[in-house]
From Swiss-Prot:
Function: Catalyzes the ATP-dependent amination of UTP to CTP with either L-glutamine or ammonia as the source of nitrogen. Regulates intracellular CTP levels through interactions with the four ribonucleotide triphosphates.
Database matches in PANTHER family: CTP SYNTHASE (PTHR11550), CTP SYNTHASE-RELATED (PTHR11550:SF0)
GO cellular component: cytosol
Misc: CTPSs have evolved a hybrid strategy for distinguishing between UTP and CTP. The overlapping regions of the product feedback inhibitory and substrate sites recognize a common feature in both compounds, the triphosphate moiety. To differentiate isosteric substrate and product pyrimidine rings, an additional pocket far from the expected kinase/ligase catalytic site, specifically recognizes the cytosine and ribose portions of the product inhibitor.
Family the UniProt entry places it in: Belongs to the CTP synthase family.
Active-site positions on this chain: C378, H514, E516
Pathway: Pyrimidine metabolism; CTP biosynthesis via de novo pathway; CTP from UDP: step 2/2
Protein name as catalogued: CTP synthase
Binding site for L-glutamine: Y54, G351, L379, G380, M381, Q382, E402, R469
Gene name of the record: pyrG
Region Amidoligase domain: start-end pairs: 1-265
Reactions catalysed, as given in the entry: UTP + L-glutamine + ATP + H2O = CTP + L-glutamate + ADP + phosphate + 2 H(+); L-glutamine + H2O = L-glutamate + NH4(+); UTP + NH4(+) + ATP = CTP + ADP + phosphate + 2 H(+)
């Protein structure tokens, strides 16, 4: 019988519901339970695929090609269960489903209303996301009291009534602010948040209180008294320097034990060996490197969430402290390469649109000419190909048709069709809406025997996740290979170039796919592990040269 844990938030947004849910999921998984998570987002967009990175942050792509909330990235980094499109639902998608059913006559002429039709669809989607797991953590986006969240809160209230206390648990996150001028913690916002939740008909079983300092026992008792939550279930969630410490912090307060007891789950003790190993790798580095990330959305770090975490994972698995410097590619265009000179390695991530592209090309040239390790991802591979074509293959006006429609040498162009692993053909054109023109999800890639890519992966066939519209133009393949660009990876049918590298460079690898989506703190990822090692080696070479010169 599947158990459901509903996670809500109050007082303010961005309290860390996703991280808390994922951390509790990790603890329950460590007890031997099959755990999955579902995110319910209250916005009306069908998915975040066409939303601005500045508003929404990263779009996390699942293996089945769904464009989802970045919290699903946290879920996959903390639990072993792979997420899919059934793990993220928005208000827009819920209403789209209901309206489609109404058009088909599924409601037999009844008036379609929020209750019961929308709430029933929400409950159906939650159960669909359960995917035979023993425990499902359901995170409700937004803040209690927001009008947008009301249908979701009503749906989980109904599930609590229908399934009963032995099958459901409600966990509420709140903020306990510290007023520095008074030197006091204030619990009143938490009391009012719980009051608001109870007015909807939901009594929380667990309170997770976000704060800067540990919660004094006197304040814990006060909160328990005014919210009717057991004192031991008032959890203190203190700020930590790494999100990967949170499972151990919650374990120390016996959150998993509280949950297991209420839900009547029979499990063994939590085995946290893997998480202890992660923390050991974080806290006892042997090296230190600075990675310069050259991007378009650097003012909003959430746009590169999986990428920054993947770099940290590489540091954990190579025992290297990773410092990430974010550099706006437009700044390179305006001020030159000064911001690159302290980099032990350079990374250019994905992105869309012409803005800042020339700055990225300058950064690629700097890395190639100065032997600085370079990793290009998605757009980062495309600008690497453009730079190589311009400066190594004599095509001075080479470009992508995304940025220069009439370039004489379109080394990157919109692909109109490709063959899937099942043999089917997928097609698209420039007239399709933005939501339907992407190559999304898992695709197989064949690696060139003897290439750096094959060596670092340790195999010649891999599966990685994609999110792009433009691709390497095969009309230029022979010419660029002749100039020294290695086509290190291709789609399984050989038609699409998925990876390129430069063999005579210390470490220059670029890929069309997004390896950051499959990197985890416990397992790392071969590309990022190798990239961090290369950065550390480059740092040692530069340090040795400087000492000799002095």
């Amino acid at each position: 019988m599947t158990k459901f844990i509903f996670v809500t938030g109050g007082v303010v947004s961005s309290l860390g519901k996703g991280i808390t849910s994922a951390s509790l999921g990790a603890l329950l998984e460590a007890r031997g339970l099959a755990v999955t998570l579902v995110k319910l987002d209250p916005y009306i967009n069908v998915d975040p695929g066409t939303m601005s990175p500045y508003q929404h942050g990263e779009v996390f792509v699942t293996g089945d090609g769904a464009e989802t909330d970045l919290d699903l990235g946290h879920y996959e980094r903390f639990v072993r269960m792979t997420m899919s499109r059934r793990n993220n639902y928005t208000t827009g998608r819920i209403y789209e489903n209901v309206i489609a059913q109404e058009r088909r006559g599924a409601y037999l002429g009844n008036t379609v209303q929020v209750i019961p039709h929308i709430t029933d669809e929400i409950k159906r989607c939650i159960c669909a996301g359960a995917d035979n797991a023993q425990v499902v953590l359901v995170e409700i986006g937004g803040t209690v009291g927001d009008i947008e969240s009301l249908p979701f809160l009503e749906a989980i209230r109904q599930m609590g009534v229908e399934l009963g206390r032995e099958q459901t648990l409600f966990m509420h996150l709140t903020l306990i602010p510290f007023i520095r001028s008074a030197g006091e913690l204030k619990t009143k916002p938490t009391q009012h948040s719980v009051k608001e939740l109870r007015s909807i008909g939901i009594q929380p079983d667990v309170l997770v209180c976000r704060l800067e300092h540990p919660l004094p026992e006197s304040e814990r008792r006060k909160i328990a008294l005014f919210t009717s939550v057991p004192e031991r279930a008032v959890i203190s969630a203190v700020d930590v320097d790494s999100i990967y410490k949170i499972p151990l912090e919650l374990y120390a307060q016996k959150l998993d034990e509280i949950v297991v007891e209420q839900l009547g789950l029979e499990t063994g003790p939590a085995n946290l060996t893997e998480w202890q190993r992660v923390i050991d790798g974080l806290e006892h580095p042997h090296d230190e490197v600075t990675i310069t990330l050259v991007g378009k959305y650097v003012d909003h770090r959430e746009a590169y969430k999986s990428l920054s975490e993947a770099l940290i994972h590489g540091g954990i698995h190579t025992r290297t402290r990773v410092n990430i410097t974010y550099l706006d590619s437009e700044e390179i265009e305006a001020q030159g390469i000064g911001g690159l000179e302290s980099a032990d390695a350079i990374l250019i991530p994905g992105g869309f649109g012409e803005r800042g592209v020339e700055g990225m090309i300058i950064a690629v040239q700097y890395a190639r000419e100065n032997g600085v390790p370079y990793l290009g991802i998605c757009l980062g591979m495309q600008v690497a190909v453009i730079e190589f074509a311009r400066h190594q293959a004599g095509m001075k006006e080479a470009h992508s048709t995304e940025f220069s429609e009439h370039t004489p040498d379109p080394v990157i162009a919109l692909i109109t069709e490709w063959r899937r692993a099942d043999g089917s053909i997928e097609r698209r054109d420039e007239q399709m809406g933005l939501g339907g023109t992407m190559r999304l999800g898992n695709y197989e890639c064949e690696l060139l025997p003897g290439s750096r890519a094959a060596a670092l992966y340790g195999q010649e066939r891999i599966t990685e996740r994609h999110r792009h519209r433009y691709e390497f133009n095969n009309d230029y393949r022979e010419l660029l290979e002749g100039a020294g660009l290695v086509m290190a990876g291709t789609s399984f049918d050989g038609n699409l170039v998925e990876m390129v590298e430069i063999s005579h460079h210390p470490w220059f690898v670029a890929c069309q796919f997004h390896p950051e989506f499959t990197s985890t703190p416990r397992d790392g990822h071969p590309l990022f592990n190798s990239f961090i090692r290369a950065a550390a080696e480059h740092r040692r070479r530069v340090t040795l040269k400087s000492s000799r010169d002095s």
